[in-house]
Amino acid sequence: MTLYYIGILLVIIGLFAIFSGIIGFFRFPDFYTKLHAASVIESFGVPICLIGFACIAADIVNSVKLILAALLIFILNPVATHALGKASLFMKIRADSTVIARKITK
């Protein structure tokens, strides 16, 4: 029963991180800060929710699958976000979001 409440708490923390990342994504002015907000959602919010769901799950097999998925997201998502940021720097995309819109339409 205690594990159930720990799982609920982890899901609430993960949802708070997702919600704050969504607010940051829409409020931040430029591409690189929006990239940071999106990485917070994917790198912290989703895995914490998955670990919370693993605590709530009744079956041990499903719990292990959820924990493995959370570990993969913890490891792979920062690498993908770094690659996206480095590629945008390589293409000399400025932080101004109007430049990105013009490069996409070309």
Curated annotation (Swiss-Prot):
InterPro entries: PhaG_MnhG_YufB
An example Gene Ontology molecular-function term: sodium:proton antiporter activity
Pfam families on file: PhaG_MnhG_YufB
UniProt similarity note: Belongs to the UPF0091 family.
Organism: Rickettsia conorii (strain ATCC VR-613 / Malish 7)
Name by which UniProt lists this protein: UPF0091 protein RC0354
